[in-house]
Amino acid sequence: MSAADGHAPAAHPEEAAYRAWLAATRDEPLESMAGFFDARAGGYEAHMARWARHYAWMAALLPPDTAELLDVGCGSGLELDYILPRFPRLRVTGVDLSAQLLRRLREKHPGRALTLVQADYTRFDLGRDRFDAAVAFETMHHLTYAQKTALLARIRQSLRPGGCFLCCDYIAATQAIEELALAECARRRRRDGIADGAFVHFDIPLTAAHELQALQSAGFRDAALVGLLDGDANTALFRARR
């Protein structure tokens, strides 16, 4: 409570909006990750176009000597639409669950050195010491802190020493929102009889502080919040090195 007036401090404005969204959608069934994106593949790029400035930002931050790139959760390659023109000889390995989005990516960039893998990137072997850089765009906010840290450790292993990792992702504005999202996802899993290990489409974002902590716990060096673009307080860009 406030010492000045005896009232509890006001909640963050985004918390009220988030609670209202949870209440409005509480009866919606969970969908598998692959099923969610395959069902919406036709409108995916139009929906994601709002992050055009973020794609360009990520592309500009890739080290100029990048020759081998890992794209985790590449989808239809919206970030690659900005990255590939900058790196004409770039070799890309993209991993995604959606066959339809991967097909769209290949259609957009014929003749480019793309190795596209339809797989769950939380389980797929990313290899060791393979890539100069790795990127992940708006994909890892469906993972718990423990799942994310484990994946980040594997991404780190896949990089060559000194390799760069760029992650642009949805973040929780407050710790309360992070906790609310996690609790609601668990409730819906129980309701729908879905095992904890099944990959479902429900946002469980971390706060920026926890995102940095996960990067550090995974062994990355120089983990930093690069920033947020004006007008978008919930999409942050992080950078780290192996």
Question: What annotation goes with each model-predicted range?
Answer:
Residues 1-30:
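N-terminal auxiliary segments of SAM/dcSAM-dependent transferases
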Residues 218-242:
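Core SAM-dependent methyltransferase catalytic element
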Residues 25-52:
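Class I SAM-dependent methyltransferase Rossmann-like catalytic core
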